[in-house]
Every structure is written in structure tokens, then in C-alpha cells.
Amino acid sequence: MAFALPSSLVSICDKSFIKPSSLTPSTLRFHKLSFIDQSLSNMYIPCAFFYPKVQQRLEDSKNSDELSHIAHLLQTSLSQTLVSYYPYAGKLKDNATVDCNDMGAEFLSVRIKCSMSEILDHPHASLAESIVLPKDLPWANNCEGGNLLVVQVSKFDCGGIAISVCFSHKIGDGCSLLNFLNDWSSVTRDHTTTTLVPSPRFVGDSVFSTKKYGSLITPQILSDLNECVQKRLIFPTDKLDALRAKVAEESGVKNPTRAEVVSALLFKCATKASSSMLPSKLVHFLNIRTMIKPRLPRNAIGNLSSIFSIEATNMQDMELPTLVRNLRKEVEVAYKKDQVEQNELILEVVESMREGKLPFENMDGYENVYTCSNLCKYPYYTVDFGWGRPERVCLGNGPSKNAFFLKDYKAGQGVEARVMLHKQQMSEFERNEELLEFIA
């Protein structure tokens, strides 16, 4: 289709605020943010789920009633879920505290005047997909007092729906988001019963207290959305297996993971597309729930992360076997560290504060710093509200640059990568022949 501006395709049918179905106890009124929480800007983690077969379509004359019914079902289950996820129904009091005042989460009901396939099959899908996210909201700096959770349900002319969630990064990471989505979708599926009660564990500042380093002022996102673009790349199972076999043979690394080979390839190609190739650094984020002693459960809610990194100072460093070998070495080192006392993410934040710059900004003097968030094995494609698995899960386009997000592809053992780069760099990156060899 000739893609129209979102304003010409989208009509908002309803906007409301969903409060927890029961009041939050006064003993839980204030949620303390950890040092890592405070180091993050007031941005959202935006994601959307596309469900092409929701239910048998009603007659066109009743189409608006169908949207109302779906919205009511989701609102009711969200209200029940927020009882357990009470900080997301509150407001930021300051950069150290969430006031869990039960003000509620914002909920939008939207009609989109096209079919879902026109969005999913669009040649610029990463841009087109953003139509199901609240306008101007994803990755935005939601100032103190803003909503910490915003949900939008969008109904297409074909009868399919998309459910998008903008989830405050101040309170939780990608694993926290998945916990919330699994709990909310489970409550929605089982809406005829009242036995299911989600049981997230909010960690707050119990692991990474601010007592050692002091409180932080909220950092701001400085990148310009108009200068940053996102591309969706699919690494099919067969091509990914070939890449892993090639790297294993040339590097000596036993069973290189999907994330290792894909992130190394993206780093190599992005660096090559940059106007200033070297020196460069690749920073991987780590979920440390199972690395902390005692281990934290998977339902722990918070920003429970660390980092490890590799560097490239010459052309030999940029060869795939070398990159993967170095990634394997550094992740093994990370697993041997005390991720509370020797947390590299905290050390980077503290060092950045000392130098008066943002984290990862010219890190250790490296002009090109790329970050990678690996969500492979996080089962986003199993989030089922009662209409089966989603056809696609997408991440909102944002003002980040030099960022890679990896997650499972919907079928097999493939990987879907979302790559965010500067416009000019992206135009060179997407023509890289080595990259094109391994993507669909």
C-alpha cells in the first residue's frame, strides 16, 4: 500500500485510566528505586503484539461493539493484574521513589483503517508497525508525574488486533516486562475464574542500594529521533546454522550461541559502515537474576542487569572468529564475578558521573560504542491473551542509536534483530554483502 501518515489511519475511540481492582496497602505506598533504576532516563520499553485471528468477526454494524468488548475484557484483567503490579499504577515522585497511589495505567482503544497485513507486509515494516503504539510515546522521556504504564488496543479492518504496551524502564527491565505480560495475559485468558493471582517480587533497592554511591539525577535522552532509524532483520534457522558452523570452525569456540554470532556480525557491519571505524566497543547487557547469590527468581521485578564488553582497535579485532572468541571469554569472566560488588554497569555509571557524561558516551575513550540487548530465549511469542500466539512481536522505533535488540524469531531457531543506527550509517550498513548473506 502507499503508506499514509498514522493520523489519517488512526482514530481513538476511547481513553481511560485503569486502576487496581483493590487498593494498595499503605505499607506499600512508596516503592524505592535502585541505583540502576535511577541511572536510567524516564523512558518506556515499548512493544506490540499482533493477533490476526481474535475471534469470529461480527457484522460490520456491530464492529465498534466488538472493539468495546475486547477493550473491556483487557481493562478488567489489567485492573486485576495491577493489584500485584501496583507500582505501575502509580507516579514517579522523584528519581528515587514511586508513589504507589493507584492513579492507574492509561488505556487507549483505537481503530486502524487498514488491514493488519498491510502493516506487517509493508516494505518499511519497522516504521509501519509503530502505528499501533501510542503516538509520540515510545522511548519518550515521561516526566515525573507521567503514567508508568500505557496500553493501547488497536483493531484493524480485517478483524485482527494489536496490543501494545509502554512499560516504564525506571521500574523494570525486559524480563520484568515479560513477567507482566505473561501474568496479564493469563488473567485475561482465565477471566471466568478468580483463582489466578500474579505473584511478582518487586526488588526495589534491596539489591542495588543507593547508600554506597548516593542518589542520581535523572539522565536525559539526547539522541534525535529524526536522525535515528530502525531496521528489522531476520536470520533464518538454516542461514544462522551455517554462520554458527563457520564461526565455530574458524574460532575454536565450541557451540557459539545465536546471540554471539549475530551480535558479532552486526557489530562488525555497523562499525564498517561508520565514518570513523576504529576504535569501537560492543557492550552486552546481562540478566543477572541467576548470577546473584542467593539467586533471584525469574519473577523478580526490577532492573537487574550488568554488562560485559569487547573492543576492536584494529582490523584483525573485527574478524568474526576473533569477535566471537572475545565475547565468549568476556561472558565467562562475567559469570565468575560478584555481580553486586563488581557490577560493571554500576561501575560505568559511577565513572560517567565522575566525568560528567552519560553512560556509554565515549566509553573508555571509544568513539563508537554499540549496545546489545539479548532477549533470545525470552518467550515473547508465547504471550497469549486467549487468541493464540502473536503473528509478530515488535519493538517501537526510538531515539537510540548504535543499539541492537535480539529476540527469537517466531518459527524455529531463527533470530530477529532490531538495529538502530544513524540514518547515514544505516544506508551503508544494510548494503553490507556479508550481512546480506545471512539474512532473509
Curated annotation (Swiss-Prot):
EC number: 2.3.2.35
Transmembrane segments: none
GO biological process: alkaloid biosynthetic process
Catalytic activity: vanillylamine + (6E)-8-methylnon-6-enoyl-CoA = capsaicin + CoA + H(+); (6E)-8-methylnon-6-enoyl-CoA + 4-hydroxy-3-methoxy-benzenemethanol = capsiate + CoA
Active site: 169 (proton acceptor), 384 (proton acceptor)
Gene Ontology terms for molecular function: aminoacyltransferase activity
Annotated keywords: Acyltransferase, Transferase
Alphabetized InterPro entries for the sequence: CAT-like_dom_sf (IPR023213)
Enzyme superclass (EC): transferase
Domain of life: Eukaryota
Function recorded in the entry: Involved in the biosynthesis of capsaicinoids and capsinoids natural products, pungent alkaloids synthesized from phenylpropanoid intermediates in the placental tissue of chili pepper fruit acting as repellant on herbivorous mammals and conferring spiciness to hot peppers. Catalyzes the biosynthesis of capsaicin, a pungent component, and of capsiate, a non-pungent component, from vanillylamine and vanillyl alcohol, respectively. Can transfer an acyl from 8-methylnon-6-enoyl-CoA to vanillylamine forming capsaicin and CoA.
Family membership noted in the UniProt record: Belongs to the plant acyltransferase family.
Protein name from the UniProt record: Acyltransferase Pun1
Species assigned in the record: Capsicum frutescens
